[in-house]
């Protein structure tokens, strides 16, 4: 379980997040809704130690003080940011292999199945040649390959077709059932 307690985030004199608390059980879904500029991304950035704020976070009964991406990855927490995490000069295959290296995984790249089927024919294509939706799918796949306990997605459907969204949701259900 992830517990966030009494989170407040301020940028200068502007209070963006005012004393919110929430809990997220492993395997559950949570959506943070709000208009542009409401602080949704700021919450994720605080969780991942990228912005300062007050409050506390407990992951699986361990208090996380000064969280870093490395600490969070070791705790099974993964963020796929809105802008993605793809290296444009690498091919799709190289991006996936690099992602595997980061997690010390020897698992083969998933072949023509599920969410990946939309990218499989592009394995040897440089990421800078992908459409916005394809780049987004690659970022999400790189995050899902880590098989995280907790997967945070910032604006997960930006640039995706309805077909890709439906396929992604099916794959997410499969991932949740396996973990």
Describe every region a protein language model picked out.
Residues 155-156:
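Walker B catalytic motif
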Residues 63-78, 83-84, 124:
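ABC ATPase NBD coupling module
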Residues 48:
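Helix-to-loop junction immediately C-terminal to a conserved catalytic motif
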């Amino acid at each position: 379980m992830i517990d966030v307690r009494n989170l407040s985030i301020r940028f200068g004199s502007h209070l963006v997040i005012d004393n919110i608390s929430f809990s997220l059980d492993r395997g559950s879904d949570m959506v943070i809704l709000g208009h542009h500029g409401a602080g949704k991304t700021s919450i994720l950035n605080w969780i991942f130690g990228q912005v300062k704020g007050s409050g506390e976070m407990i992951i699986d009964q361990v208090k996380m003080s000064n969280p870093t991406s490395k600490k969070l990855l070791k705790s099974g927490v993964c963020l796929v940011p809105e802008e993605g995490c793809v290296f444009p000069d690498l091919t799709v295959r190289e991006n996936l292999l690099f992602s595997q290296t980061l997690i010390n995984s020897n698992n083969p790249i998933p072949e023509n199945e599920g969410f990946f089927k939309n990218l499989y024919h592009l394995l040897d294509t440089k990421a800078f040649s992908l459409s916005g939706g394809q780049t987004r799918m690659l970022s999400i796949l790189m995050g899902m390959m880590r098989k995280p306990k907790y997967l945070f997605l910032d604006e997960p459907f930006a640039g995706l077709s309805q077909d890709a969204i439906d396929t992604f949701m099916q794959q997410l259900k499969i991932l949740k059932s396996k973990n």
